[in-house]
Amino acid sequence: MQAANDHFFTGLSKKGPVRKENQDFYGFSFNQNNLLIVVCDGLGGYKGGKIASNLVGKLFLSLFEGFEFNQWDETTVKKWFENTLIQARFQLENCFQTVYEAQIQFARMASTLVLGILTKSDIYIFWIGDSRAYLLFENQAKLVTKDHNLYNQLVAMNADEKLLLSYSNQLLALTNTISKETKRPLVYGFYNTKIEQQEFLLLCSDGLYNFVEKELFFEIITNSKNLKQAVFNLYRKSIENASNDNITAALVNLQKWKQS
């Protein structure tokens, strides 16, 4: 994993005051002067959440660093992502079968993922689950991911208010994660844009965005003396607002990255 460069990217991941362990993961990796950033959130309700998030995150970092990209475009990065996602599933299955000898409490270990690939001109965002990516500029925070949860799935199906109400206690349940289910269809979210006037890219887990209003992201970051202080201030604000989860943020100064 590439060490953070506080001039244009950094990150932070902490357990928080409630959880017994930190099941989040974040990291950075380079390939041909292009940058990958990733945040994973292991499923807290299951055994092995920390194992899953670390295995998945580290695999994406290492395979990005070692892959020979012939070109940097949407088709190429999507193909790389899909192949790496397949490998992640098989590694989770292998981990379950060999390391944990198919112990039933580890059968549902899984992780979310949000991942950004940055060239000097483009941003490619992939996600699975409910970890998020925001683009920040002009005192605004634009959410560019869409949570894979029951609510969004029902809305996409044009569910009426009555049906939504009947699932009111389950609407935030995840409908897509990275798990050991190797035969499931590959489903992921994707977003691509040019680096223009955007100032920051923020990837984060729900322990942060559920407890800090996105309208405050830009102010907190730009009022901090550097990126390292910015991610700590985001963490501190989520604690002040009673976050009950692990808290992870990975932050890139896009203009400094573009010029580096």
From Swiss-Prot:
It is an enzyme of class 3 (hydrolase). Its EC number is 3.1.3.16. Gene3D superfamilies: PPM-type phosphatase domain (3.60.40.10). InterPro entries: PP2C (IPR015655), PPM-type-like_dom_sf (IPR036457), PPM-type_phosphatase-like_dom (IPR001932). It holds the Pfam family PP2C_2. Keywords: Hydrolase, Protein phosphatase. Residues 9-254 form the PPM-type phosphatase domain. One of its GO terms (molecular function) is protein serine/threonine phosphatase activity. GO terms for biological process: signal transduction. SMART domains: PP2C_SIG (SM00331), PP2Cc (SM00332). It catalyses: O-phospho-L-seryl-[protein] + H2O = L-seryl-[protein] + phosphate; O-phospho-L-threonyl-[protein] + H2O = L-threonyl-[protein] + phosphate. PANTHER family: PROTEIN PHOSPHATASE (PTHR47992). This is Putative protein phosphatase. It comes from Mycoplasma genitalium (strain ATCC 33530 / DSM 19775 / NCTC 10195 / G37).
